[in-house]
Amino acid sequence: MTKDISKNESVVFDVQGLNLWYGEDQALKNIKMQIKKNKVTAIIGPSGCGKSTFIKTLNRMIENIPSVKTTGEIIYQGQNIFAKSVRVEELRTKVGMVFQKPNPFPKSIFANVVYGPRIHGIKDKKLLMDIAETSLRNAALWDEVKDRLHDNAYGLSGGQQQRLCIARCLAVQPDVILMDEPTSALDPIATYKIEELMESLKKHYTIAIVTHSMQQAARISDDTAFFLMGDLIEFDKTTEIFSNPKDKRTEDYITGRIG
């Protein structure tokens, strides 16, 4: 069961009848949901349910796999993202991605953050430094690295590397941040810092996060979507999903009876 929870709230993604196949295997089945502006939407479900596939479809990153084919629409900024007129590079700038494992480039901390702006033609050193500082501040990392910006990013801890990847994403001024299990490789303290950061970031960005942790979804998200075997079983406000699920399969999953 999916509920329309978008009344009086701005919709960033309107997903309409989305189907996706890997070759002959269907991974997403007639997905219909809306992701709201300046909210955190959690995508939950057991391994292989389609949640990572879904989130990677929102900026068409899934198309890097040759066998993928899709039907349906994802409306973003009034346009179907699958339309031929959509430039994928621009879409991925506006809809950034943070992955499960921190993936800094083998460059300095500074060079990591300004990599995107440089690709987009920004060369002015002062402007690049301003972008780096702003992005690192917004990723809650500036105070920890401001005196070693030209050190190799590999010298950072895992949690710091993940926040650096978030800063790198922010540097190109996205509207949306997609996160695919961003804390699964981190310790509890680093996880807490990322979760605290998400609460701050949603004031300016829309966030969708895939997580295996029910506790994390309950803590950080405003809305939650439960996927099972490629189907969207239930989508509602997080408080409703965890306190009053409408579908027994949702209840069974969040209470540990399936998954």
UniProtKB/Swiss-Prot annotation:
Reaction(s) catalysed (UniProt annotation): phosphate(out) + ATP + H2O = ADP + 2 phosphate(in) + H(+)
ABC transporter domain residues: 6-254
Gene Ontology cellular component list: plasma membrane
BP GO annotations: phosphate ion transmembrane transport
Catalytic EC class: translocase
Membrane topology, from the record: Peripheral membrane protein
Assembly and interaction partners: The complex is composed of two ATP-binding proteins (PstB), two transmembrane proteins (PstC and PstA) and a solute-binding protein (PstS).
Family: Belongs to the ABC transporter superfamily. Phosphate importer (TC 3.A.1.7) family.
Name of the protein this chain belongs to: Phosphate import ATP-binding protein PstB
